[in-house]
Amino acid sequence: MKFGVGWLSATLTATAIFLQHGDARSQAPPPIQHVSELDNVVIHTPSHRIHSHSSFDITFTIHNNAEPIKLKLEPNHDVLAEDAEVQYLNADGTISHTESIDRRDHRVFKGSAWTEIEPDHWTYVGWARLYVKRDGPDPLFEGTFSLMHDYHNIKLRSSYMRTRSDSDIIPAEKDEDYMVMFRNSDMYWDEEHTELKRSLPNPSCQADKLDFNADPNHPVFRPPQQSANLAAMSFDQLLGLSKRQSDTGGVGGNTGGINLASTIGDTTGCPKNKLVALVGVATDCNFLNAFGNNQSAARADVISMFNSASSVYESTFNISLGLKNLTMSPAECPDVSSTVTPWNMPCTSGNISSRLTDFTAWRGDQNDTNAYWTLMTNCPTDSEVGVSWLGQLCVHGSSNASVAGANVVVKTSTEWQVFARDIPLVPYMTATLRHVNKASRERHNAAR
């Protein structure tokens, strides 16, 4: 499929909606200062039961019953590719066995969020993504919903404690697991309120120490041009547009020579038919260790992360994220990393940049057409929880410098936001985008 210049311009400008001041690395989120419990939770179906293909409403209250919330949900059929599979590795990095990922095993939903401004009068306030872990009269679920552009993150207390930093508030301990919620606006430092911080100029940034990212001839560092002539730009320049600092030109930013100030937020030309970008994920020993060697829990966490992150791209570009390949390392970290999977090493070995380099070389050997591969780990480097190559989306092969479409994401309380920020989609992903057409929908309906 060919994509027109109109879509290219729209996609690049729309990127600024979410990827403001973006670059090749992500810092850890600020401390969580406040959490709320979900009360009066009801799944509005007969017997409060659902399955993977159900459409239903969930209602609950937050902030000590002060605010009623309704989530109107339907299945997210795109979160898993039809032929999605998981590979389980041995300690030496060789493949132990491979299994298909059955969509029916994962109750993953998308939809909208509503608030009750007066009795029986509900107002739309944003989008919603949920992964239901338990249905019935006492349900448990995790996910995210947006209320007036403030992300509300729902986690089981056990999941929250798994990623809690020393500065985060500690929810009350109870006899049984329960759901807690924190907003992005509940995350701030004592003196300044920020969300996930990304900063290129900091010389301590691990991404800046990568020779490829620091190359002054890289397209993302080229000065702005007088004309935003997309048709005259080289493919390399287009690749570089995935890094953004400022879309208005000037000293602080670079857009590969395009000034997009007048078109930020304009989605004219975006695809009318939904497209899906297929992505591969590998998890290292440290990631699985965070789940107590529970492979099912780790797999569900990755799928839930995809579900939430995809909402940003669906609403902006009409492009969804779909998990195609999942490669899982055993929980026991090797004393010496294998030559097959050199990225699988203890947190005490290497840093986030060396993990990216090793993982990218491995990614280059994979025979697939995925748009991107992500390594999930539990090993930050200082405050850095994400790193990627500049402008390398859809680059499949590795070079002598081991540069390709890959990134590293560290498990955090808001890992879905790190994941979303590090895979800015662009419209030349022709090899990895597929139409969600009528035939596909018919196959999904037949599976019910």
Regions found by a protein language model. Give the residues of each.
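Non-catalytic, regulatory and substrate/membrane-recognition segments associated with hydrolase enzymes
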Residues: 139-216, 223-225
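Short, glycine/acidic-rich beta->alpha junctions
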Residues: 103, 301-305, 412-416
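Classical protein tyrosine phosphatase
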Residues: 6, 129-146, 300-317, 431, ...
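Fold-level signature of zinc-dependent metallopeptidase catalytic domains
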Residues: 25-51, 189-402
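N-terminal prosegments of processed precursors
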Residues: 2-178, 347-353
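The catalytic-center signature of Zn2+-dependent metalloproteases
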Residues: 324-350, 399-448
